[in-house]
Amino acid sequence: VPYNTTAEEVLSLQHDGLFIYDGPGDPNDVPSVVKLIQDLQGQMPILGVELGHQLVCLANGAKVVKMDCGHHGCNHPIRNLDTGKIEFAPQSHNYMLDADSVEGTGLRITHVNVLDGTPEAAESTIYPTLSAQFDLSGDHPLYEKFLKLMEEGKRNA
């Protein structure tokens, strides 16, 4: 759907979830998408990836700031804080979640960049909402988690 779609329009489509992907520029420049996420959280599972991650973070009250040196290229090491495992993923972003702004938002940081410690993924402790700053491979566990959230949503509808 276009960036200026309303929550009512999205809900009328009767989809099982909302996937918000990448795009150019500063996430602070698209408040309409931030509002859309705020309006839909709790009504359907949401997965934000790359720019979508930044928008999910803003929608939950965290800050997203411009990085001094962005992450670009392949094979960036990322630590999964739940498992302790190191994953590798391509990245291309100049903005990041401000880790100091997460407290009190209901977000929990789940992955960090091994090289500089910046947050790379988060999930809501309140809503069925997930997000990742890095490009997810086709079999990444976050997709499976998102699918499970959508299945649970259908059972509880």
Functional labels for PLM-detected ranges:
Residues V1-Y3:
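Short hydrophobic/Thr-rich beta-strand motif most characteristic of the beta2 strand and flanking loop
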Residues A7-Q14, E103:
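Short amphipathic alpha-helix with an adjacent loop that forms part of the alpha/beta core around
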Residues S12-F88, N94, A99, S137-L149, ...:
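Cysteine-nucleophile active-site neighborhood
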Residues F19-Y21, E123, Q133:
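Structural motif
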Residues G84-Y127:
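Catalytic beta-strand/loop cores that center a nucleophilic Ser/Cys/Thr
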Residues P128-A132:
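Catalytic His-Asp charge-relay segment
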